[in-house]
């Protein structure tokens, strides 16, 4: 069926604004972002946010900024109406957050909105807006400032509504946004009420250090390196995490340029280069950095939500960063040397006639809790059942081919079975065994979960802890029982066998970090992604040789769940 050509026409303003909203307003957090930026641009130093239903039910932002006169409100609802610029050239000397004049009309076109505002000494007015158009305006006294209430977000664009995530995920996105706002804006007081409960409160008198401790935790501040360096018009201020606080992704990095939260691969790369000799490969440092640059050096007009930036004079910026970071790290050089040069001295006894060294975990005992069957796990893909062979001869725990350890060559092991000699790649094997340990019920449910005599604790940010709280049931289905002991920490009550404690803690933190940032990602995908990114030692000394038996009980797989080579049979051709 072919469509007949139609005449070219101008779109009406509501349709134009709804299209624009598709670029600017991704979810409820996008609405909160635009409204609080309007408050900041209006000179507010107290901002109060309330949300219901993750923001889709209601968003209210109240401030004590300059406010508007009644006749300004209809103008503010027009596309490209702004008080920030008059000409295009003004963008390059901009000190405000917004400048396009698109946000307010875009939000109004996909919600029901109410604006209550007054200038100093003014009478005040309240305007009701539906589908982007004012339907009622009446006098309403109030103190100087503006309150914007947004109800029924996406009510008239059901297709957009169907693509939204859960209210819990929306709350996580709003929390991360507000945490960045708290870090970027000193001298501003913040209050966030979510579902009628106070989630965040920051007094405007609280300084930068207090705010970093609130968001990232006091332990981060205590161990981090503080930097504050200025060269002419350039300044860098913030905290660099200690070498012990590295992560598997860049999600622990918070960057602000001229008080705007942005992403910059250039800045991240420069910081990573400074840490290269102090943290393992494929790991990323944590930092909170605020750069203050001349406005004409920064182009924020790259992304609709202004989360990306182009920079001029990268050489000067790089020099400032390198000097500031080097000075900070050198001030703590003794402790760094101790961290970097510490070599494990524990010897692991090996018997060449077989694997007789058990996996010793003195802090853990067997518990009656059994790992759930796979049918109880809606979170994991059924396709992943191919990880464990379904051939009863190879997958049985009672009838399994014997494997004999021969020698260690650092990154690989040489082992022998009835088929011949195999090269086992340590890192890939460790990763695969960690992953399969999460699915230990695949081994005919013979492997009981393990309970810690003294529960180990794991710490993270409040945002990450909130995500983990929502996934406790899914983690229990994997044999991992957690209990929340503070707003930013959990106790690990039990775990699958054959997972080392430190690796488990690292993975839990990585899962929380990844989940808090990618709020729409499925749980099974998060599990797979985070295990892939986890750095397992390439050193055979760190490999528990008793796990070779388990590897062979899994049918001695050649490849890990992600396709990486685990073992290879040594053939005669290898010596020709």
Curated annotation (Swiss-Prot):
Coiled coil: none annotated. GO terms for biological process: mismatch repair. Pfam families: DNA_mis_repair, HATPase_c_3, MutL_C. GO terms for cellular component: mismatch repair complex. InterPro entries: DNA_mismatch_repair_CS, DNA_mismatch_repair_MutL, DNA_mismatch_S5_2-like, HATPase_C_sf, MutL/Mlh/PMS, MutL/Mlh/Pms-like, MutL_C, MutL_C_dimsub. GO terms for molecular function: ATP binding; ATP hydrolysis activity; ATP-dependent DNA damage sensor activity; mismatched DNA binding. The keyword Coiled coil does not apply. The keyword Endoplasmic reticulum does not apply. Keywords: DNA damage, DNA repair. Belongs to the DNA mismatch repair MutL/HexB family. PANTHER family: DNA MISMATCH REPAIR PROTEIN MLH, PMS, MUTL, DNA MISMATCH REPAIR PROTEIN MLH1. This protein is involved in the repair of mismatches in DNA. It is required for dam-dependent methyl-directed DNA mismatch repair. May act as a 'molecular matchmaker', a protein that promotes the formation of a stable complex between two or more DNA-binding proteins in an ATP-dependent manner without itself being part of a final effector complex. This is DNA mismatch repair protein MutL. It comes from Chlamydia trachomatis serovar D (strain ATCC VR-885 / DSM 19411 / UW-3/Cx).
